Amino acid sequence: MIKTALVAALAMVGVANAYISTGQCPTPTLKASFDAVKYMGLWYEQARDGGMPWESNDCQQARYSLNTDGTVAVKNSQYDPVADQVDVATATATFDGAKGAVRFFEYAPAGDYEVLDTDYSTFAIVYSCSSYYLAKAEYIWVLTREQFVDDTLMFSALQTIRNKVPNYDQTSIRRTTHGGSCKYLNEVQPY
C-alpha cells in the first residue's frame, strides 16, 4: 500500500511539473516506417520540457538496445554536479511503429513515447502526452547523436514540433548543457 501511494505521489509530481493545458492529447503524425533497429544506440539530449522534475540536471544521455524478446532496454543518465555522480534510470519500452510505451518501475503505468521525427543518424524528436480528465500533460525531447549541435538543427527541430504539435507551448522547452564539467557513463555497449 505504501509503495503504491509513493508511486502515485511521484507520478503526480511529474504531472504537476509538465506543460499542462486543457483538452485531450493530440494525435500527431509520427515518423513513418519507423525502424526501431536504426533507432538503437546512444543519443544526447539537446532540449526537453523544462518542467520534468526527474530530469533536473544537464549532461543527459539516452541509450537504447534491443532485448531478445523484442522489447527495448532504456538507460537514461544525467550528471549531478552537487553529488559529483552520474545518475542512471533504467526502463523497458515496447514499440508499435513510432509509438512506444516506457515503464521505469514495475508497478508504475507506462509512459507515452512518440517519435515525431528522426533521421536515425543525426536527430530525433520525441513527444509524450497523458490525458487527465479535461487536461493533458505534455513533454518534448530533442535528441541528437552528437554531443554538440548547431543552431540550424535546433531551429529545424522546433519547427517540426510547431508543425506536428501546434498547440504545444515552446516557451517551456529548455536547452540541455553538454561539455565543460559534464561526466557521462563510462561504458560501451554493443547496439
Residue ranges of model-derived segments:
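A beta-rich soluble binding module of mature secreted/lumenal proteins
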Residues: 2-191
